[in-house]
Amino acid sequence: MAIRKFKPYTPGTRQRVVTDFSEITSSKPERSLIVSKHRVKGRNNRGVITCRHRGGGHKRQYRLVDFRRDKRNINAKVAAIHYDPHRNARLALLFYEDGEKRYIIAPAGVKVGQNVISGESVPIEDGNAMPLSVMPLGSSVHCVELYAGRGAQMVRSAGASAQVMAKEGDYVALKLPSTEVRLVRKECYATLGEVGNSEIRNTSLGKAGRRRWLGRRPQVRGSVMNPCDHPHGGGEGKAPIGRAGPVTPWGKPALGLKTRKKNKPSNKLVVRRRRRISKRSRGGRDS
């Protein structure tokens, strides 16, 4: 897979960089694994905006993805690699020997016609799912369960992978993409390899309209609003925010405040916290 650049025929194509979609199969999505999804546009059940800058975009249908990999010791053949409008990662369509069809997150390097399997005594190959207790030290994994049988909850985005660092007692230490080292129960399942479509980080939308197609509305800086709309608003011209530090639209400290609960039960499972991102490398915008 590679990225594709365009000649600057228009201002939108000048900055546009996309993936070439060469790994995606031309077949249509599996109808039995597609359901309609009501889009909430950032509103809750009362119609109140709870997530700003959401709405519009192209109509989507949700693909049912198997995050549990609970069909043990049954070979499955990769029949197709499909696009998923709800995530940057691709989906691999599996045909099991017993006739069942399922979607999984497509690992990097998985080809059409390849066989994958899940279980405790399966080959150490990319795409196979197994408990963390039987994985070799130093191996890269993705789609990691936090609780056995609940399904993968971590390391599911495009290009992501965690590393098996150590095994001790009932726990396995994983180094997550955020550099955090966390303990996970050894009976939890994970998939070998990293998630595919890692080149997505090198792409560029190129124009505001393509962002609207994805359901993202414009983000207005707080410093250009009125005082009644944002704590940064008001003043004559380009006025400073008038506070010791930037805040959210609701007056809470922004950019750097730790939001994790201090008495969270899973704190004892975090061996090393993720490294803190500096303001210069964050590149955040005025909220």
From Swiss-Prot:
<dbReference type="InterPro" id="IPR022669">
    <property type="entry name" value="Ribosomal_uL2_C"/>
</dbReference>
<feature type="region of interest" description="Disordered">
    <location>
        <begin position="221"/>
        <end position="287"/>
    </location>
</feature>
<dbReference type="InterPro" id="IPR014726">
    <property type="entry name" value="Ribosomal_uL2_dom3"/>
</dbReference>
<keyword id="KW-0699">rRNA-binding</keyword>
<dbReference type="InterPro" id="IPR012340">
    <property type="entry name" value="NA-bd_OB-fold"/>
</dbReference>
<dbReference type="InterPro" id="IPR002171">
    <property type="entry name" value="Ribosomal_uL2"/>
</dbReference>
<dbReference type="Pfam" id="PF03947">
    <property type="entry name" value="Ribosomal_L2_C"/>
</dbReference>
<comment type="similarity">
    <text>Belongs to the universal ribosomal protein uL2 family.</text>
</comment>
<dbReference type="InterPro" id="IPR022671">
    <property type="entry name" value="Ribosomal_uL2_CS"/>
</dbReference>
<dbReference type="GO" id="GO:0003735">
    <property type="term" value="F:structural constituent of ribosome"/>
</dbReference>
<protein>
    <recommendedName>
        <fullName>Large ribosomal subunit protein uL2</fullName>
    </recommendedName>
</protein>
<keyword id="KW-0689">Ribosomal protein</keyword>
<comment type="function">
    <text>One of the primary rRNA binding proteins. Required for association of the 30S and 50S subunits to form the 70S ribosome, for tRNA binding and peptide bond formation. It has been suggested to have peptidyltransferase activity; this is somewhat controversial. Makes several contacts with the 16S rRNA in the 70S ribosome.</text>
</comment>
<dbReference type="GO" id="GO:0015934">
    <property type="term" value="C:large ribosomal subunit"/>
</dbReference>
<feature type="compositionally biased region" description="Basic residues">
    <location>
        <begin position="258"/>
        <end position="287"/>
    </location>
</feature>
<dbReference type="InterPro" id="IPR005880">
    <property type="entry name" value="Ribosomal_uL2_bac/org-type"/>
</dbReference>
<dbReference type="GO" id="GO:0019843">
    <property type="term" value="F:rRNA binding"/>
</dbReference>
<dbReference type="InterPro" id="IPR014722">
    <property type="entry name" value="Rib_uL2_dom2"/>
</dbReference>
<dbReference type="GO" id="GO:0006412">
    <property type="term" value="P:translation"/>
</dbReference>
<keyword id="KW-0694">RNA-binding</keyword>
<keyword id="KW-0687">Ribonucleoprotein</keyword>
<dbReference type="InterPro" id="IPR022666">
    <property type="entry name" value="Ribosomal_uL2_RNA-bd_dom"/>
</dbReference>
<dbReference type="InterPro" id="IPR008991">
    <property type="entry name" value="Translation_prot_SH3-like_sf"/>
</dbReference>
<dbReference type="Pfam" id="PF00181">
    <property type="entry name" value="Ribosomal_L2"/>
</dbReference>
<dbReference type="GO" id="GO:0016740">
    <property type="term" value="F:transferase activity"/>
</dbReference>
<comment type="subunit">
    <text>Part of the 50S ribosomal subunit. Forms a bridge to the 30S subunit in the 70S ribosome.</text>
</comment>
